[in-house]
Amino acid sequence: MTPQAFTATVVGSPRIGPKRELKRATEGYWAGRTGRAELEKVAATLRRDTWAGLAAAGLDSVPVNTFSYYDQMLDTAVMLDALPERARQVSDDLDRYFAAARGNSDVAPLEMTKWFDTNYHYIVPEIAPTTKFALNPDKVLSELKEALAQGIPARPVVIGPITFLLLSKGVDGAGAPIERLEELVPIYAELLSLLADNGAQWVQLDEPALVTDMCADAPALAEAVYNKLGSASNRPAIYVATYFGDPGASLAGLARTPVEAIGVDLVYGPDTAVAAVPELAGKTVVAGVVDGRNVWRTDLAAALDKLTTLLGSAARVAVSTSCSTLHVPYSLEPETDLDDALRSWLAFGREKVAEVVTLARALRDGREAVADEIAASNAAVASRKSDPRLHNDRVRARIDSIVASGSHRGDPAQRRASQDARLHLPPLPTTTIGSYPQTSAIRKARAALRSGEIDQAEYERRMKKEIADVITLQEQLGLDVLVHGEPERNDMVQYFAEQLEGFFATQNGWVQSYGSRCVRPPILYGDVVRTHPMTVEWISYAQSLTDKPVKGMLTGPVTILAWSFVRDDQPLADTANQVALAIRDETVDLQAAGIAVIQVDEPALRELLPLRRADQDEYLRWAVGAFRLATSGVADSTQIHTHLCYSEFGEVIGAIADLDADVTSLEAARSHMEVLDDLNAVGFSNSVGPGVYDIHSPRVPSTAEIAESLRAALRAVPAERLWVNPDCGLKTRNPDEVSASLKNMVAAAHEVRAGV
């Protein structure tokens, strides 16, 4: 059967629901408030509405199997029967799935890390020597049948075998998972046959790993694998999707295989990639010309120019997003506070689908058919270029002056001596990363302030009570360096964005970070200006309640960029320095208020690292420079902390050392302290706090378990440089879990401290 050609599609779509319905349903299930039937009903409704909306908008190929209760890599591990043995002990299939993702009282969760250079986190499959791959196609077949029954032109989407293995982790003495690629090819061939038998005309196999340098043999592997899969006698047409950058030599390799379509990211990859591969002349090129991971409106005229150049290089050209719209909010419609100019510059998920359809129509019927849409796009482009909010001469001049004079602090040993004399901390000092649980009282107060039920003064009174409670709790637990708990902050980036010029904070711009965790990235559209202190009053109040040091808590410039939708009209380095200047001014004001410890978090340092090694040094140069610009305005006696989240730390370990923070805390529990060896390898000599327990899991670690982690850390870090802290902030945990875990952490620190 000849597959029906398609002209307009998207790589994938969000699954959390336009009002975060899936978040509420899964959290209700985890808490035991609702049952499986209720959860599955919500999921089915979300799938139905998503598919219907995409088809109604004009897509003639709709991705399915992009829904997930937690994560698509975990879904693929289930499909390949590759869950670890410890999770298999759970008899119920859904509870087994969630145990692998989140852990429970008996099962440690799988590791979690960033999905390429995005802020989405995926669950890392473990491939052991005992892992026996086998096909479990129930989910993908079920969703295909659902969609076809609904009359949807459905295209199942599955993570491809190369990407699955390159993003998995070998355990228990296993070699690199990619060494087992040959075992997966017949399983994928079996899947293709089942999909064809159940009515799929097309299948999309996602291979974003091909745009990275993760495997030098990737181009050859891609050609070999897709030659075999493309030669299968019973299969749908195959569309191999690459995204997040340039597939390089893999593009030509794929073009030499029998697959029918290849997706290319023409937003984050070069426009010339397709023209350089003559073998594409017989293929459908799925052209990712609409940015799937940022919120700026597409310049339709420029995108059409790109598409037109492709027409002579491919048998067919289909229009698509550059990647899944999982990474952007659902729609601009709820954003009623947007001014007309800013609104005209933006496109969220629904608007991006409309852009794809418009561009496909222009290719089919000519530019005249979409003349009004092109005119509106041109007007938005012109409006954005001329808006005065995009340029502040004073900020730019200050940055130039500071950078020219150098952004360096004093000698680390001298700083440590000065800080020791000021702080008088014991060996293995205990602390937490920053946030404490956002209680129902906090959320109610925030909602009451928004609705006008309470005024700002009453809101501040309630937040100060929360701060006082957190300070009291920490003193009772015996922590050494305290935090104020951040009750006043809705989000560690949005809180600052709401107080800085150049940002717009959305009302409903939610995107998935991991599992049920959703974030609302602000939009950074203009030059960044700090007009007033943002945290000093809250931190000073917390410090007034205790004789122990309270950390000032700030978010670093790279993380603010990584977790925002950032302007694309100037280099990221320039924008990072503008944010860094605002943070620098805040650190100076905190120091003037008597705060002796200031934490500038950079959990997303690894996130923005370019996927190709050739581009990485330049990024790390300006990322480190921005952090130093933010932190070099304080005295040697002020202790600067930073915190970094799950990532492949080894790739940026030199940059972590170059940040030159006095204390660096890192997520390390799930990866079993592996990062400490990496730090030692680059001669890291400042203090470090490797996370001693995993806060992403609801399980409470025992004192013995934490003590064991501390002793493991002491084998790599001397006691005088080792701090004791959880993996990350505690915002998403419940208060009982936090108290029990921290009690055990402090007890473990005392136990180990006695022996050093």
Swiss-Prot record:
Keywords: Amino-acid biosynthesis, Metal-binding, Methionine biosynthesis, Methyltransferase, Repeat, Transferase, Zinc. Pathway: Amino-acid biosynthesis; L-methionine biosynthesis via de novo pathway; L-methionine from L-homocysteine (MetE route): step 1/1. Binds 1 zinc ion per subunit. Zn(2+) binds at H643, C645, E667, C728. It comes from the Bacteria. GO terms for molecular function: 5-methyltetrahydropteroyltriglutamate-homocysteine S-methyltransferase activity; zinc ion binding. Its cofactor is Zn(2+). Pfam families: Meth_synt_1, Meth_synt_2. Disulfide bonds: none annotated. The keyword Zinc applies. One of its GO terms (biological process) is methionine biosynthetic process. L-methionine binds at I433, G434, S435, E486, D601. It catalyses: 5-methyltetrahydropteroyltri-L-glutamate + L-homocysteine = tetrahydropteroyltri-L-glutamate + L-methionine. Its EC number is 2.1.1.14. 5-methyltetrahydropteroyltri-L-glutamate binds at R20, E21, L22, K23, K114, R517, C518, W563, E607. The active site is at H696. L-homocysteine binds at I433, G434, S435, E486, D601. NCBIfam families: met_syn_B12ind, PRK05222.1. HAMAP family: Meth_synth. Catalyzes the transfer of a methyl group from 5-methyltetrahydrofolate to homocysteine resulting in methionine formation. Belongs to the vitamin-B12 independent methionine synthase family. This is 5-methyltetrahydropteroyltriglutamate--homocysteine methyltransferase. The gene is metE.
